[in-house]
Amino acid sequence: MVDITAAELLAAEKIFGDRLDLAKRYVEHLATSGTERGLIGPREVPRLWSRHVLNCAVIESEIAHGSHVADVGSGAGLPGLCLAIARPDLELTLIEPLERRVIWLQEVVDDLGLTNVTIMRTRAELAVGMVDADVVTARAVSALTNLAGLTIPLLAGKGEVVAIKGRSAGEEIEKAAKVIRKLGGIQTSVVTVGESLLEEPTTVVRIVVKKSQKIA
């Protein structure tokens, strides 16, 4: 079993509530089959809770009730599966092009009994027209100049991109400003999430989008 500190447990209880056991089972999947099959590096196991699961799960506070969320480049389910566990009111579409990752994701979804998750084996740019999300999430996919073009077209006429980023978030916004505006972004900001829960809060780039017409 993956160790969890008292502080991590407190944060996990607040985020996952009565679904904490599901979160613990997910972490065990990450630590075992996830590492065996190359979705998570072995060195990450001791910090799965703090650096990965809680880091991702706290962004649930930025997503409105009942939203359809598309998670681009879902990989090991970060943040997609974290959100599906924390927020059963959300409808999650996990978009992942690599077959071995898709197989693993489906195994975890089936084992946890998550009925609010759909997995698509495809690239984000090929999912345009098949997904009309209210919110698109991403973590460690690419720089914002490229990520904007992968995420914004997946939104319905209006919506939000919630991308987990690092300390360079502000610089990325500056470089991507023109691309974001062209795609329909009307407001872009850096938001710090989880300050009261995590030792290292999560940095999020939030893009509010209102498109005049569907971008193909």
List the model feature ranges, each with a label:
Residues L90-A216:
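S-adenosylmethionine
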Residues V72-S74:
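Conserved beta-strand/loop positions that form the S-adenosyl-L-methionine
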